[in-house]
């Protein structure tokens, strides 16, 4: 007698176009319609399994059952991740490389990052006071680019900042794009990888000497399990894997501004300077608004879970956005409520805006701590250190666009620094 259950299956030859059309809601919509946290479909011409929820996240991050190597579509590798980056590694190789990333996330280094972020916000607000209007998303990307480079020990000239900001942004803005936007994203990555490769060569030749605790120094001199230096191409990819995600925090900064505008009562609460409430607000922004839609892996070997058969090599998608809006996990998930984090216990599988699992042993985003600290500084500036007006504009955002940002990119005007 068989114990294998029939997995709910989406009809159709291929559903890639539906995923592109529905974006963040694709998996969640079908979880609702099938009344199931797991279903089968076809994506990019191949069988795929989509799943969401806390239990699904727990099994997805089981490294005995899933692997990351060769899971991401090539067009995403060519724009977002780069080749041979930490996201595509498994086993001891992944663990060793991940330790390189975690080595720059010490409390002291995060404090340095916080100080740098504050200084860059100060400079930006001074500039904004002289501007008729500020397109916050574009300006936030530049703040984040300057912050990332200074913290990572990457020397960048003033006349290079605009180019680098634009190109780092293009890498994550084009990850789900087709046509010209995709090719612009690929060109942006190729250009900056070559630029960083040349910089790493100069570090190794002794011509550039970044501080020892910085990304550029550590990644330039990192040795793999065999004791070899990373080839310059891979080292450059990993340096960009620090810079690019910090620039992407501009998306969250945009949503912070949107939340402050839509929920003015929250802004009043934040003016008290309560650090705990600031943390709760930041976490709710990360939960409530769209960032990563899903993550992908391949089934490592045949196994059965909840009566469903997973066959080796099957592409599997974990619903990040949907898990953060799962009513089984979150009460009133479509209501913006920072208070829900007052007694939150910090599960690594129920709250997964940037992925789940363990920081050191698993594939949870190493930069999550960076994101939270930078967001708290940004929230403080938008709440307590400057005044501004939000003129009429289109603040809606599309759940089909990946990544999603408000259509107007949040325009503010009449910026005044508080004394």
UniProtKB/Swiss-Prot annotation:
Substrate binds at residue 244. One of its GO terms (molecular function) is oxidoreductase activity, acting on paired donors, with incorporation or reduction of molecular oxygen. Keywords: Fatty acid metabolism, Heme, Iron, Lipid metabolism, Metal-binding, Oxidoreductase, Peroxidase. GO terms for biological process: fatty acid metabolic process. The keyword Metal-binding applies. Its EC number is 1.11.2.4. Heme binds at residues 61, 68, 94, 98, 365. It catalyses: a 1,2-saturated fatty acid + H2O2 = a 2-hydroxy fatty acid + H2O; a 2,3-saturated fatty acid + H2O2 = a 3-hydroxy fatty acid + H2O; dodecanoate + H2O2 = 2-hydroxydodecanoate + H2O; 2-hydroxydodecanoate + H2O2 = 2,3-dihydroxydodecanoate + H2O. Its cofactor is heme b. The keyword Heme applies. It comes from the Bacteria. Belongs to the cytochrome P450 family. Fatty-acid peroxygenase that catalyzes the hydroxylation of dodecanoate with formation of 2-hydroxydodecanoate and only trace amounts of 3-hydroxydodecanoate. Cannot use hexadecanoate as substrate, and from tetradecanoate, forms only a small amount of the 2-hydroxylated form, with large amounts of substrate remaining. Can further convert 2-hydroxydodecanoate into 2,3-dihydroxydodecanoate and 2-hydroxydodec-2-enoate, the latter product likely leads to undec-1-en-1-ol via oxidative decarboxylation. Monomer. This is Fatty-acid peroxygenase.
């Amino acid at each position: 007698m068989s114990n294998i259950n029939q997995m709910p299956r989406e009809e159709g030859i291929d559903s890639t176009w539906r995923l592109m059309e529905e974006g963040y809601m694709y998996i969640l919509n079908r979880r609702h319609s099938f009344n199931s946290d797991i279903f089968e479909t076809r994506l990019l011409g191949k069988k795929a399994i989509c799943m969401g929820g806390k239990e699904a996240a727990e099994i997805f991050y089981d490294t005995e059952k899933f692997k990351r190597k060769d899971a991401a579509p090539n067009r995403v590798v060519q724009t977002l991740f780069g080749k041979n980056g930490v996201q595509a590694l498994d086993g001891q190789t992944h663990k060793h490389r991940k330790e390189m990333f975690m080595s720059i996330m010490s409390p002291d280094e995060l404090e340095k990052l916080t100080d740098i972020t504050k200084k860059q916000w100060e400079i930006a607000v001074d500039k904004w006071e002289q501007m008729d209007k500020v397109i916050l998303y574009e300006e936030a990307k530049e703040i984040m680019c300057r912050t990332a480079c200074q913290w990572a020990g990457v020397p960048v000239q003033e006349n290079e900042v605009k180019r680098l900001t634009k190109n780092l942004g293009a890498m994550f803005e084009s990850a789900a794009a087709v046509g010209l936007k995709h090719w612009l994203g690929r060109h942006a990555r190729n250009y900056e990888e070559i630029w960083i490769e040349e910089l790493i060569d100069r570090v190794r030749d002794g011509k550039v000497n970044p501080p020892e605790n910085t990304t550029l120094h550590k990644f330039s001199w990192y040795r793999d399990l065999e004791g070899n230096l990373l080839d310059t191409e891979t080292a450059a990819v990993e340096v960009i894997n620090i810079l690019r995600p910090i620039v992407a925090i501009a998306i969250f900064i945009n949503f912070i501004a949107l939340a402050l505008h839509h929920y003015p009562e929250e802004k009043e609460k934040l003016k008290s300077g309560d650090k705990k409430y600031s943390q709760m607000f930041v976490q709710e922004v990360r939960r409530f608004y769209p960032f990563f839609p899903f993550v992908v892996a391949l089934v490592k070997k045949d196994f059965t879970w909840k009566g469903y058969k997973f066959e080796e090599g099957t592409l599997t998608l974990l619903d990040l956005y949907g898990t953060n809006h799962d009513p089984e996990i979150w009460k009133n998930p479509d209501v913006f409520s920072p208070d829900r984090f007052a007694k939150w216990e910090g599960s690594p599988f129920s709250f997964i805006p940037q992925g789940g699992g363990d920081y050191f042993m698993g594939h949870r985003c190493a930069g999550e701590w960076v994101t939270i600290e930078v967001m708290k500084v940004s929230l403080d500036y938008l709440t307590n250190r400057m005044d501004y007006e939000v003129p009429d504009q289109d603040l809606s955002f599309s759940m089909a666009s990946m990544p999603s940002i408000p259509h107007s990119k949040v325009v503010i005007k009449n910026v005044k620094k508080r004394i």
